[in-house]
Amino acid sequence: MAGHSKWANIKHKKEKMDAKKGRIFTKLTKDIIKAAKEGGGDPETNSKLKLAIERAKAFNLPSENIQRAIKRGTGELGGAKLEEVIYEGYGPAGTAIIVEALTDNKNRTAGEIRHIFDRNGGTLGAAGSVTWMFDKVGVIVVEKTDSINEEDLMMVAIEAGAEDFSADEGEFEIITDPSNFQEVREAIEKAGYKISEAEITMLPKNTIKLSPEDYEKFEKLIDKLEDNDDVQNVYHNVELEDE
């Protein structure tokens, strides 16, 4: 059950993206709109919405913005209709990249994403070209403390349906199937553990290490993609360097 953490190899990219406060509010708002549109405006019965709200609060998105986003999602407020679009492509040295976007104009976004790939050593691919290299999973992270017994936490996670458990430097990582992500998360919280991160994500089945030259090109491409206002998430299979 215990193993090496793939999440640790890719998450500092996420942290870097999250630090861009100027754009993160827009992305958080779109996440809430999408979740409310798909599952209704009650976070108690809509786990995706609950997760989106919690993440928004962690970044201090004002409550009125959260409520307005929920109402846009449920149709109580007007506004442009948002659609989720997935793009797949290749970066420098054949790296695999998946881009999740929420947009009110698919033609505009497709053109912008294609332009970013073309100008930064990448190629936009067809649907299904790289998704087979990834697994869609739930990731739950619990920070290590002196009071936590690793075996006890692992048993709680396993009994709730977790698929994998690993101990990394300073934290425990629990991997779940997306279908029982919320169930495992609630079991861990009920047992008294404090969760530091929890989300549905795409983890690469294998990661690759790039040469310094290719890595620099790859990082520039990822930064450009993440800077696009319509882009919500960018996933890849590159082993990241420490910053």
UniProtKB/Swiss-Prot annotation:
Taxonomy, superkingdom: Bacteria
GO biological process annotation, one example: regulation of DNA-templated transcription
SUPFAM superfamilies xrefs: YebC-like
One of the record's GO cellular component terms: cytosol
One GO MF term: DNA binding
Keyword vocabulary terms for this entry: Cytoplasm, DNA-binding, Transcription, Transcription regulation
Localization (cell): Cytoplasm
InterPro entries: Integrase-like_N (IPR017856), TACO1_YebC-like_2nd/3rd_dom (IPR048300), TACO1_YebC_N (IPR049083), Transcrip_reg_TACO1-like (IPR002876), Transcrip_reg_TACO1-like_dom3 (IPR026564), YebC-like (IPR029072)
Pfam short name (any one): TACO1_YebC_N
Recorded family membership: Belongs to the TACO1 family.
Name of the protein in question: Probable transcriptional regulatory protein TTE1135
Organism: Caldanaerobacter subterraneus subsp. tengcongensis (strain DSM 15242 / JCM 11007 / NBRC 100824 / MB4)
Lineage of source species: Bacteria, Bacillati, Bacillota, Clostridia, Thermoanaerobacterales
